[in-house]
Every structure is written in C-alpha cells, then in structure tokens.
C-alpha cells in the first residue's frame, strides 16, 4: 500500500469510528498532535482514544498529495449545527505505517 492509500484508510476508519482499524495502520510509537492539545496522544491506544473523543462528523475529500514520506489530505469537515472547517491531515509515514499525525484547521464559513 502507498502512503496515500494508508492515509485514506485511516480517515475512513475515523469516519466509521473503527478505532482498531485506524490503530492497525499506525506504528507502535505513533504520535497524534491534536489542535490545542498540550501533549500528543501516543501509541496505538492514543489513536483509539482520539477516535473515542471525536464528535460525529461528515467529511468530503478536497485535496491530497504525497511527497517524501509525508501525506497531506485536506477534507471539508462538518459537524452539523456545530462547526464546519477545512482540515488538513498531515501524515508522516514510516514505510507503510503512520508514525505521526497532526492537523491544520481553517474555517469554512
């Protein structure tokens, strides 16, 4: 699988709220940097925690690129009645696994 395929699979697992499927796409030592958080979530259990904390939302893909072990996917993320923003998912890959994930947010309204 390419890095882009792994990243797409991860986003699909998040949307489906399948924490185990998302965690399996990551290295043992993965770090997830959430916007506004002081410390990253670490390890596959941190990925599972992120999915348990996430609100229900709708996503549509807008842009994606892969370059030198990094994948960037931008989505329009909507939680109806709560928020809408453009989310850029920044994946750093280690072979065919996600080693680091961070986010850039931009308002959509």
List the predicted regions and their residue ranges.
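A solvent-exposed, acidic/Ser-Thr-rich amphipathic alpha-helical stretch
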Residues: 20-23, 28-69
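Hydrophobic alpha-helical segments, principally membrane-spanning helices and signal/leader peptides
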Residues: 2-3, 28, 54, 80
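A beta-strand edge to alpha-helix "cap/lid" segment located at domain peripheries
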Residues: 48-109
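Short, low-complexity N-terminal intrinsically disordered segments enriched in polar/charged residues
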Residues: 1-20, 24, 33, 97, ...
């Amino acid at each position: 699988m390419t890095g882009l395929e792994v990243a797409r699979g991860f986003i699909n697992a998040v949307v489906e709220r399948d924490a185990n499927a998302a965690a399996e796409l990551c290295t043992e030592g993965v770090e997830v940097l959430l916007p506004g958080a002081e410390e990253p979530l670490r390890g596959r259990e941190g990925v599972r925690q992120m999915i348990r904390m996430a609100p229900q939302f709708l996503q549509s893909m807008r842009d994606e690129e892969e370059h030198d072990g990094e994948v960037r996917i931008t989505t329009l993320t909507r939680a109806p009645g709560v928020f809408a923003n453009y989310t850029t998912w920044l994946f750093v890959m280690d072979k065919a696994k996600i080693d680091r994930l961070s986010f850039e947010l931009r308002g959509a309204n």
